[in-house]
A protein has these predicted regions:
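Amphipathic alpha-helical scaffolding segments comprising HEAT/armadillo-like alpha-solenoid repeats
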Residues: 1-9, 28-45, 68-82, 105-119, ...
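Eukaryotic acidic, Ser/Thr-rich intrinsically disordered low-complexity regions
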Residues: 115-118, 122-159
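Structural detector for internal amphipathic alpha-helices that build alpha-solenoid repeat scaffolds
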Residues: 6-9, 13-29, 49-68, 87-106, ...
Length: 159
């Protein structure tokens, strides 16, 4: 794990990508020592955009599938429709919106903000015509709202 930690700190997205295979073969508890680096690799893309977005997405999937609460926080940050980073938030949102399905009702506290994001997407230059994404977002919001049995999320720090 020491090598994986160093690789995830590498600014090259291509190098970071080599670590993502661990997400499929190890448990969150086993990866706890490198969890800060996993989260940081989601937050800050490497300079190789082609690979770094894939690394970020795989990190989000790992956290979502394992009910890690920090993953929901990162997902909210990534899909924020911030015009200052339009090529990231607007472009990346259609790729990652589906991961809210793992959080379902545990994301209810985020519904007001998600509705604001949805309205912003409807008027954005980049996503206003992306009907598939807008429909998917509506389905996700309905799923979150109607979920009567939300999953129990846990922080990676308590693993």
């Amino acid at each position: 794990l020491a090598a994986a930690k160093r690789i995830l700190r590498n600014p090259c997205g291509g190098a970071r990508a080599s670590v993502t295979t661990l997400y499929k073969t190890m448990t969150p508890k086993q990866l706890k020592p490198i969890m800060p680096e996993i989260i940081e690799s989601i937050r800050k893309p490497g300079w190789s955009v082609m690979f770094s977005n894939n690394v970020r997405e795989k990190g989000l999937v790992f956290l979502a599938e394992n009910g890690i609460s920090e993953g929901l926080d990162e997902l909210m940050k990534i899909i924020e429709p911030d015009p200052a980073r339009e090529n990231e938030g607007y472009w990346f949102a259609p790729r990652v919106i589906k991961y809210f399905k793992h959080y379902r009702g545990a994301a209810k506290a985020q519904l007001p903000k998600l509705r604001q994001y949805q309205e912003a997407y409807k008027t954005s230059r980049m996503l206003s015509k992306n009907e598939r994404f807008l429909k998917e977002m509506t389905k996700i919001l309905d799923l979150i709202k109607k979920d009567a049995n939300p999953p129990n999320l846990r922080s990676w720090k308590t693993l």
